[in-house]
């Protein structure tokens, strides 16, 4: 069912894969399906862009989130997402998707068509989904890939999701739902689940026991 729902959006003429810089640099693009607009009044915005730049960067920010070292080398030079996704200044690495910085006027993109391509690809598997994966890669300036088996295909999809959705809140959930979090991040098994809130356990003892490890 996931691939059918994703394919229905891919077929919708209101949406299309767009140039990557337009997604985060222009309101006029056909790729974004759903996003929160940030208001201009002071104090009304969640200012997500403030989190990714240092105060010394021209965009200014609190620099609460920064890309891991391997992120800075995972993009091929011909990947059209590279300059929009990451940048470096004064030996500091930055996520570059939200350029309004401290002003916080960037929209918060929740869902866009590229995700539908990768959902469809993953749901269909190697035989049915490879074309969708490669269509997205070609749009982003990359060559087609030819994984030899389902495991390699899933790894290719997950890597593409990492490249496409850097700093958009997908990576942790991708690793957990595919059982790769402990291997990739070195987390313990119990950390892949949140604890049940003690308040809810108090009100509903039938929820006990808590998730393992808590």
Feature-to-residue mapping (PLM):
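Acidic/polar-rich alpha-helix caps and helix-coil junctions
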Residues: 1-48, 61, 69, 73-214
């Amino acid at each position: 069912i996931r691939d059918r729902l994703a394919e229905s959006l891919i077929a919708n003429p209101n949406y299309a894969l767009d140039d990557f810089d337009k997604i985060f640099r222009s309101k006029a693009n056909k790729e974004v399906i759903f996003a929160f607009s940030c208001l201009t009044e002071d104090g009304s915005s969640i200012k997500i862009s403030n989190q990714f730049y240092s105060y010394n960067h021209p965009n200014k920010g609190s620099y609460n989130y920064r890309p891991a070292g391997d992120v800075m080398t995972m993009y091929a030079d011909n990947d059209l997402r590279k300059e929009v996704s990451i940048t470096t200044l004064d030996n500091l690495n930055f996520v570059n998707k939200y350029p309004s910085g401290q002003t916080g006027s960037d929209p918060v993109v929740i869902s866009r068509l590229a995700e539908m391509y990768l959902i469809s690809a993953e749901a269909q598997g190697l035989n049915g989904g490879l074309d969708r994966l490669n269509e997205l890669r070609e749009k982003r300036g990359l060559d087609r890939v030819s994984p030899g088996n389902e495991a390699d295909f899933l790894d290719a999809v997950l890597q593409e999701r990492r490249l496409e959705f850097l700093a958009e809140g997908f990576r942790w959930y991708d690793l957990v739902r595919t059982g790769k979090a402990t291997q990739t991040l070195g987390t313990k098994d119990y950390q892949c689940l949140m604890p049940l809130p003690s308040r809810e356990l108090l009100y509903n003892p039938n929820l006990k026991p808590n998730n393992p490890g808590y």
